[in-house]
Amino acid sequence: MSYLNLRLYQRNTQCLHIRKHRLAGFFVRLFVACAFAAQAPLSSAELYFNPRFLADDPQAVADLSRFENGQELPPGTYRVDIYLNNGYMATRDVTFNTGDSEQGIVPCLTRAQLASMGLNTASVSGMNLLADDVCVPLTSMIHDATAHLDVGQQRLNLTIPQAFMSNRARGYIPPELWDPGINAGLLNYNFSGNSVQNRIGGNSHYAYLNLQSGLNIGAWRLRDNTTWSYNSSDRSSGSKNKWQHINTWLERDIIPLRSRLTLGDGYTQGDIFDGINFRGVQLASDDNMLPDSQRGFAPVIHGIARGTAQVTIKQNGYDIYNSTVPPGPFTINDIYAAGNSGDLQVTIKEADGSTQIFTVPYSSVPLLQREGHTRYSITAGEYRSGNAQQEKPRFFQSTLLHGLPAGWTIYGGTQLADRYRAFNFGIGKNMGALGALSVDMTQANSTLPDDSQHDGQSVRFLYNKSLNESGTNIQLVGYRYSTSGYFNFADTTYSRMNGYNIETQDGVIQVKPKFTDYYNLAYNKRGKLQLTVTQQLGRSSTLYLSGSHQTYWGTSNVDEQFQAGLNTAFEDINWTLSYSLTKNAWQKGRDQMLALNVNIPFSHWLRSDSKSQWRHASASYSMSHDLNGRMTNLAGVYGTLLEDNNLSYSVQTGYAGGGDGNSGSTGYATLNYRGGYGNANIGYSHSDDIKQLYYGVSGGVLAHANGVTLGQPLNDTVVLVKAPGAKDAKVENQTGVRTDWRGYAVLPYATEYRENRVALDTNTLADNVDLDNAVANVVPTRGAIVRAEFKARVGIKLLMTLTHNNKPLPFGAMVTSESSQSSGIVADNGQVYLSGMPLAGKVQVKWGEEENAHCIANYQLPPESQQQLLTQLSAECR
């Protein structure tokens, strides 16, 4: 095998991006020829490639005249990375046609393709008169536009003057590229169970099954959740199993409104009113449809440039924005939201080197909206709750938030029902150095279960401030119910003034309720104060404090919660010290816990280049004390196994004693496996009195036009990998996900309205499988099942030595298989590499435009070639 073809073969079996035309060896030789040709004296201005630089016999070299015109590649379809004005747009298959003598080959881009990249087609004279599928002569229709193909990088560089571009935010993906997915049915299953041996209370068994089914048709998504439970114990006669329907809903996106329509069971957001479950209809904004540079709150930057200038924006010392602006006033409204606060330092650098620097204060709270952005929701239906103590009144709710200039936001909403009416209005402000604040008030009229009517007001405020110099973040949330007559909507749905949120009678068995399940409308909430503070200590430590205090009308009982902790790392050893306190208004006493956790990875003691399996393991120690004398100590190891790290394990052992409980040893062991067809887990725990075995399996089933594919539990948005013939290929960046025996796999999650990269690991392909391209990009809508297709060539990898009239075929000749699925370029000695070839067939060869500059070679391979990594063959081309 020649060196050039050996390199050609290695590149096509190891590279992730497998190109349609394999050109490495060819262009090495061609580059040498170009270098000499450039030094040769010419009698005219035209460039001439002397074939004698490549071979002694000019007839041994294919027609290279196209390269004399600057044409580096023959016309055809190539997969390239498209960059517009130095910004990455997409990776796509682009058809290139023959251009004029100076252009070489030029890309065939349609009007729709250019529009999807941000070109304002209406601003280009005559472009809208072209048919949708006609190639746009970009450089002739737009003055100063350029199109250049970088063959070595397989990158298409386009430049279009800014005057012809639409004003789009960073990260914008045109809705035309959003993929609603395929029609398909899906089923998620999650089964778990345990068996308990209790030396005191006897044996018991429990099982639980959660089924989440769905159907996608076009842009519509139908979803349903149902559960089944089973339990039996020695303390009760017989066993009990129960099916329960949880919810069903139908939804779709409304793209022009950047909104989502939900029919059936859903829930409202808790930004203005308390979130509630409902059965009805909802139309609400979906900010996931916005580019990341338009989500969350960020100030709008205004400035003036004396000339063409470079604008750089920093936050907390990091560059978060960089752009070039034309002379005159400019506006920047596509800054990515970064944290809750941190002033923005804006630098305008002019062409002459002079700079302007100013600071824009920045702090945020959750309700703040960008200038000009509106978020809304409209809901109508009936109140829905799994609590038998609550009724199902019909209601209407609407909310609206709108961003104003100068960092202001106004918002409000209304809730209307037969026994409840509430109106809310509020304002928020980015106060810069003083932080961010939002204040709102709700006026409510309520009728309680005893038919008493109440009027009341609730005032809420939210404050956030970061002290960047000291690394301190303060978030203060305060609720103050100024009158005793304020109730929320859920309070009016109860059928009684007090009781428990669970059934206290199960047949003949009396169920003892928990104090957390108790409610009493006579003691409605009065005021609540929450405070969260985080403090950065050096580079590797963080201190956090969080607490809340809830008071009630008519009683001195209060709810209290407090958490404090210190997280730190010394080299790669992590440890956490934490404290928690919980006090319920109807609880006697309080619950406290002091805990210490230490994790030490085994890699701490291994060389950085160690291949030991222990590099994926860690040792752990934990101690907890309830401050009433009871302490638990646990020590153990955890980590992952197998090549894909898809088998995780954890083993812990320890001792618990003191306080009111029994003393004795305790411990547990677990195994969790994540595979291409689903997940499984098993575990065992023990103490002196109780032994427990628990287990579970979970996964997803996807039924589509090409069959049924099993996978891991499916999230809302998934990707179906279709690579027929490429069985057992690993999907990159996915633990345990491989294609099945047909070449299909399911990626259990994807990010909606964003470009998702899906790639197959070519190192895991069978020896007789090759891919045109191992990477696909998809942009799914929410809830979509999108298909990522890969074209696999299943067949023999063949290194052919072709001769014509007993001489090697010309260097640079194009070779195409009979099915046109594989092609290559002849290197030295008439050798060419082809993949996906059948045992018998023919190849077509062309090395010029003359009538006698082409031939056909037939070949026949032995059956054992199918088991060989590479087969070599010589054939005569006639």
Please identify what each model-predicted range represents.
Residues 178-180, 205-218, 242-255, 392-406, ...:
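Feature captures outer-membrane beta-barrel proteins of Gram-negative bacteria and organelles
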Residues 111-116, 345-348, 669, 754-765, ...:
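A short, solvent-exposed beta-strand micro-motif common in secreted/extracellular proteins
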